[in-house]
A protein has these predicted regions:
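Long, terminal "pre-/pro-" and other extracytoplasmic accessory regions
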Residues: 2-188
């Protein structure tokens, strides 16, 4: 083997090592970005302190947000959440066989945005929620109103319908400060 060939082997190894390190860095940055996005989207159960801090800026109650979304379809779930670092009131609606996410302005009650639900997990959840609401005789806004009346000082931050032994119920998350309370209201 010539001296030039012998010298080029360590150089090739150094180039390959630098390439591998650069590739690992790109993967690490991508994973960090994904984790940050997940952390910015949180529910009351995940980060009650963040939601408790942001909730006072909302003058629209969850049941009012559900009512406001009715022009886009039948509300099948709703929640306050921290999305991209900001408070957001999100309501899933159903019109025919189409599902949408309606973003309600938490200060005015006006509809800010409506988007068709296309994400597979979100679509699966919407279908399950619509099945529960198909046999419901009580609307979600009424269930939320009843839950908040029965729990003085608490504010509803989410409502998710489900079937419990074949009967429709609303699982409602309430908050008072950072205190999180879960209640169930019958929908039949």
């Amino acid at each position: 083997m010539s001296q030039d060939a012998a010298r080029s082997i360590p150089l090739k190894r150094a180039i390959m090592k630098a390439y591998t390190m650069r590739k690992d860095l790109v993967v690490a940055v991508a994973v960090t970005g994904i984790l940050a996005a997940v952390a910015l989207s949180s529910r009351a159960e995940d980060n009650p302190a963040a939601l408790a801090k942001a909730l006072p800026e909302a003058s629209v109650s969850l049941d009012q947000g559900l009512k406001a979304s009715e022009r886009e379809g039948k509300p099948i779930s709703g929640k306050y959440e921290i999305e991209d670092g900001a408070l957001q009131l999100s309501v899933y609606t159903m019109k025919g066989d189409q599902f949408s996410e309606v973003i309600v302005d938490h200060k005015t009650g006006a509809i800010k945005k409506t988007e068709k639900i296309t994400d597979a997990d979100d679509l699966k959840n919407a279908k399950e929620q619509s099945q529960a609401m198909a046999s419901a005789k009580v609307s979600l806004d009424k269930a939320v109103e009843d839950a908040t009346k029965a729990n003085s000082g608490y504010r509803a931050v989410s409502v998710m319908p489900t079937l419990d032994v074949g009967k429709p119920v609303a699982n409602i998350t309430l908050m008072k400060g950072e205190d999180v309370k879960k209640v169930t209201e019958k929908l039949d």
